[in-house]
């Protein structure tokens, strides 16, 4: 269908979902599968999927300075970013403000996702936890992504999603215990809802998309511990305050930066 002298426009704005196919057209060293070279092919994209001179970008990426990872690096803090394949870009490229290369003092670890998460709803939680616990004394800051809740919720299967969340619950519990033993502080949060709402109330159909439900922000540390009744906790969970933009400054304050 695509011939020489054609123009090819990619209009999806999600880099992590588009860079693979775009690389097949503009990557000089692409060798994942055989392809026919097309002369004078004009390839354009809505946003910057990859850094390649052959890709014409309609809206270049604005430079974002002093993101959390960059500020930690400037303050000589060692940081560890870990996720499985499904969410690796979220703890690297996206977390680092659309920068592909790690900052000084940053280590990235990728745990390869299993082929069928429906048959393995625990996904890579065990490997991620094991790696974090083994590295806990070597770094000042960790950003850890557990993909189960998001990935499994897209299938709309409540039973499978519950198993995935249970795996996360166990994993977070192990990390929490290790962090508190060392006198550290831990934050548990998310950037969107999904697993908590898998059915549309109006129709009863499966709800498999992200939603804008309020997400929790749990601040865990001995200095923040206080007794609260079940009613207090339930009341707090119904309130919505704060923004995702508040998290990075909160972390920097906790770290004395």
Task: Describe each region flagged by the PLM.
Residues 1-257:
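Feature captures the catalytic ectodomains and active-site-proximal regions of enzymes
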């Amino acid at each position: 269908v695509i011939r020489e002298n054609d123009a090819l426009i990619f209009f999806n704005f999600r880099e992590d979902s588009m860079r693979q196919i775009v690389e097949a057209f503009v990557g000089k060293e692409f060798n994942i599968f055989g392809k026919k070279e097309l002369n004078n092919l004009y390839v354009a994209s809505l946003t910057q999927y990859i850094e390649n001179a052959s890709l014409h970008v309609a809206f270049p990426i604005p430079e974002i300075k002093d993101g959390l990872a960059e500020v930690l690096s400037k303050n000589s803090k060692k940081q560890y970013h870990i996720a499985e394949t499904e969410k690796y870009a979220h703890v690297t490229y996206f977390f680092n403000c659309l920068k592909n290369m790690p900052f000084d003092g940053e280590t990235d670890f990728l745990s390869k996702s299993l082929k069928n998460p429906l048959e393995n709803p625990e996904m890579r939680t065990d490997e991620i936890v094991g790696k974090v616990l083994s590295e806990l004394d070597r770094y000042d800051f960790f950003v850890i992504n557990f993909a189960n809740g998001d990935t499994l919720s897209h299938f709309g299967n409540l039973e499978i999603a519950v198993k995935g969340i249970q795996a996360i619950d166990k994993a977070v519990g192990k990390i929490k215990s290790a962090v508190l033993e060392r006198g550290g502080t831990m934050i548990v949060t998310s950037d969107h809802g999904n697993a908590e709402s898998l059915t549309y109330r109006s129709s009863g159909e499966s709800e498999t998309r992200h939603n804008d439900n309020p997400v929790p922000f749990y601040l865990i540390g001995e200095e923040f511990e206080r007794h609260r009744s079940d009613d207090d906790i339930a009341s707090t969970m119904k309130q919505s305050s704060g923004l995702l933009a508040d998290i990075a400054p909160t972390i920097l304050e906790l770290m004395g930066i």
